[in-house]
Amino acid sequence: MSQRDAKKDGLLYTTNGVSPTPPKRIPVPSRQNKIEENSTTKNFPHSRHTSTVAGTEGGSSLSRRHTSAESRKALPNQQQLAQSGLLNKEEQQSLKRSDTSVFPKAVRKVSSSKICASCGQVISGQYVRALGNIYHLECFRCHDCNSLVASKFFPIDDPTLNKQVPLCETDYFRRLDLLCASCGMALRGYYITALNKKFHIEHFTCSLCYTVFGPNDSYYEYEGKVYCHYHYSTLFAARCCGCDGPILRQFVEVYRNGVSQNWHVPCHMIYKFWNVKLCQKTSIETSKKKDSELSQSQLRKREKHLEQKIFHIWHALSYFEEYTASCISDMLLLVSNGEFTKSVICAQKFIRYIEILFKGIDSLETILSSFHAKSMPYVREAKLLCKKLVSIFALLAKCHNSDIRDVAIVQDFLSLFTGLAHYLKLLIRISLTGGLRLEQDHACKHALPQFLQTVEEARFVDQEGYDSSSFDMPLNLANASSDLCYVCHSALEEDCVLLGEIRCHIGCLSCTKCKYNNRENYDWARWNNQTKQIECYLCYTESSNVSNDEPHPSFEYVSRLSQYIYLLRIALVRLYTILMENNDSSQRKPLSVDPKQENVSSTVETAKQAETTASSDSFRKYANTLNDLRHLKSSRNRKATSNETQSSSNSTETSKLSKNVSESGKDKSPHWHSHGGSITGKSIVEQASSPLERRMDAFDENRAFTLDDIPKVISEQRNREHRPNAFRHMPSYTDPSYRKNSGAIYDKNDGTQKGLTPKSEDAPIRYLSDLSNLELLFTKHVAVLILHPLVRDYYSLDELMEMSDLRKGGFWEKFGKAFKGKDAEKKNVKKKGTFGVPLEILVERNNAQSTVGTGVGVKHIPAFIGNTLAAMKRKDMSVVGVFRKNGNIRRLKELSDMLDVSPDSIDYEQETPIQLAALLKKFLRELPDPLLTFKLFGLFITSSKLESEEERMRVLHLTICLLPKGHRDTMEVIFGFLYWVASFSHIDDEVGSKMDIHNLATVITPNILYSKSNDPVDESFLAIEAVHLLIENFEKFCEVPREISLLLDDPTLFYNNAAWTSKELYKRCEEIISQMSLDERNTPKHTASTKRKRQPIRRVTTNLTSDVPSGSEVADTNSLSSTTKDEASPNSDAQPKPQVKPQHAVIRDS
């Protein structure tokens, strides 16, 4: 073969065994190599190294590209090349001619002393030259996975070996954290980071289907895996306790009965405001099965419909509550200012609101009757609501010329307005329940939306001022016979028939000629205008005086609720007529008005400013508190509305998908993610405030003035009336400047505390429920020392210390206990169940956090008590005999057994108020240690024996401080509830529970305060008197006594673990008592707002830009870099990438 042919084929042969000049390599890359080079040039540089192979001694040399597999095979000789068919005929002939050539007999062998840098052995065959060393072909392997990398490798500095080591492509990209978590291949271009993993864009899919998440799609995480909306909703999403829909975004977590319940935010607000769940238990069991049977589009449509329904319910009813509550507030404010005429205009607007609600209830009732379903129980509540409003009109007519500062009149007004809010709330709940029952039981989908649309008509009611010209009711309604039946002349307070201005009972319809009467139907009745009589259809047509061409007037049906509205209008017109006749009401000056009221209400025209008199008017105080609350919430609402656009643009959250959702809490919580972006060179910033999230702000319970706020403010006003001195220097709980921890005033000299100079207007009010365990122990100790001088005739100091569990046992007492069994004291203690279990165990095992009562701290009470009181608050507590009657004894036994087995097994809403009250008494009666404890029974009885009322109050107050924390928190919640129940004792002459504070104390005392001994001395009357004082002044007894509170404010008390002896505490207490007077102090009832737990909506962005430089950039920088950017975390965790210089590995033969 000629030299020319050899160059042509890229082959070089030698006959003397000495290798000539190495052949020139002519690389011919394959198509696959071309594609790889093109892709890597654009996205990521990597070295593609070629190998030069030299034949063994006496053979031919071949220079071409080698793969890692080919490098393991021996080079072919001439015969093998000829037989392989790779050469054409000319090349085969050339090989034959070369075979005929004569080789020298003596062949010169070259000895080699090359050493492999990896194994240290002598290289006698093929070898690789790379990284400045030579290796056996089989020894040149990846440092991480030990695979052959002679064909292509990536050098990297190894800090442990202090030299460069070769890596394969996979391990190199693994060290750079640039491997796809799905396919395991290198990431050379755009990628997505999610769940702390990286994915190719086309590989970021659902774990159960092939849904690819685009830049603006949402994904859901569960147990480290990614799911689409459909599979997460049907398989793993937590269910809402209200609607049983999947929880995919924000939610509220409620800990109840030892179980954590998850709620949608609007579902929880609907349940909290009206105690209504949107889904029944029967449908909850099959909801997941139904969801799995739906397609993705059907599931999306169903969820969208559910979301719209929930929002429609909340929006319509919450706004209706706000309108009605504001109207009630305006009405009472006008009455307090003496603006009686304007108050009538305000009442006219309130009647229109009621008319809208009654119209919606009638529409639901009509649909229920078409399905022959059970009617809604709305009659009693609607009747009591109208009676209270009529009573307000009667009271205004009675006292419009008299002094309205009379305490009895003030209390009557407060009770009536409390009843208005209470019964209006019940009617909203009843109507909502009826609409949901039609939808779920009878598949009537249009009933509830129709009712909500009717309620939304309240926004069209005139919202302007209360000018006297706005009164548009006909004055002829003031006639004496306008509210009577036309036939029987009796009161018409039920459904009736109407023809023009004639109204009569359906049962009173009777033909004056033939005496026909049908009490079930009224279609036959006609009105004869000539005779002014009611006739049947036959008598009416047979009459010669009636022309056939004339229309035949027939009666129309008037529902019961429509008749109630008609009666309210009559009462209002009569009041308006009285006020017009006595023109004094429109000219009299308003009672002393606070100038601050001018800017309080935007809907009420305040009276002219007058000087504030020294004597405080009760209505003016109430109006200040109520309108401060309205102003606070309305300003918050206006601020949120005006800043909605700004917040939607500024409240942005930028992060990559790699950001972990650590705020979401538990693994079972839904992790909802969204990533967005476009192929630009920068990170994408996506707004986190989507329309749904902005709409979530509407579910803030503190943004609107509701019917629940009215009883709270009225309760505060009553407390102010009973104890004005306690509230003289205390701000209202609606004052934003009010804080729990206001500092006490100390007189210091050279850093040493000389004494305390308390000021009544600045002294903080502490509550027993807010104290820490150390402060409670200190309070008990000091209370015993203060209590001893007051009861020294009855108990010694040691006996008081033993009552409060503060006395440490002596030697003989401990010696005697050593002989007792370990379970001697606890052998009869029941630990499982609900009834008969000690209160401390119930609180520790399944407590409910309650904010009812005074103070801002959370009170830990048994879950049963929390559920029972919450259910009773939503009931009608004006039922006669509540807490006095024993209820159904058999049902009580069934309920107690069910609660012992499973606390969640009963539905409190299905029980009557009397049954729930009896169940609560049974629970208290069966406590092993009563609520007020056996040990302190004597102190409570002793307090009732003291002659001085001031001493009785002090002894009771200090005795309360000695109660265990669980007993005291439970007592505070129960007594606060009983105080509220007593407000329903007398609503009017016919309605009321007749259970005032004394009657409640009489029936509850045998269950909470009794002696352990069988002493024949009957002390039940003394116990009742003690409990009566506790209920009547429960807010005062929830405070820390003033002298103890000042001690707790001492900064040196707990400084450096200061240890006080009893004598030091007693001496310190005497110093404080000598400096201050013990006047009565109290605080307004303050209810802490319930915080809503939000699940953070994770907003992430996809970095779709290629962070990998091109090949030319690598040539300039001689480095490889791959960075991941996280806009949400400025301090990125990106690690420095190793410097890589492209090199060629040369494979030779030794």
Swiss-Prot record:
**Sites bearing Phosphoserine, chain numbering:** 690
Q: What is its main location?
A: other
Keywords linked to the UniProt accession: GTPase activation, LIM domain, Metal-binding, Nucleus, Phosphoprotein, Repeat, Zinc
Give positions of region: Disordered.
Answer: 1-78, 586-683, 726-759, 1078-1097, 1104-1150
Q: Where in the cell is it found?
A: Cell tip; Nucleus
Residues annotated as domain Rho-GAP: 837-1038
Checking SUPFAM superfamilies in the record gives: Glucocorticoid receptor-like (DNA-binding domain), GTPase activation domain, GAP
Where does the LIM zinc-binding domain lie? 114-177, 178-238, 483-546
Q: Name one GO molecular function term.
A: metal ion binding
Q: Where is this site: Arginine finger?
A: 884
Q: What are the Basic residues biased-composition ranges?
A: 1088-1097
> Per UniProt, what is one Pfam family of this protein?
RhoGAP
| Basic and acidic residues: compositionally biased ranges | 1-10
Which residue stretches does the UniProt record annotate as biased composition, category Low complexity?
A: 642-655
GO cellular component terms, semicolon-separated: cell cortex of cell tip; cell division site; cell tip; cytoplasm; cytosol; division septum; nucleus
Polar residues: compositionally biased ranges: 40-62, 598-617, 1104-1134
Question: Which CDD domains does the entry mention?
Answer: LIM1_Lrg1p_like, LIM2_Lrg1p_like, RhoGAP_fLRG1
One GO term of the biological process aspect: actin cytoskeleton organization
Protein task:
GTPase-activating protein for Rho1. Involved in the F-actin patch localization, cell morphogenesis, regulation of septation, and cell wall synthesis.
Recorded protein name is Rho-type GTPase-activating protein 1
Q: Which lineage?
A: Eukaryota, Fungi, Dikarya, Ascomycota, Taphrinomycotina
Q: Which gene encodes it?
A: rga1
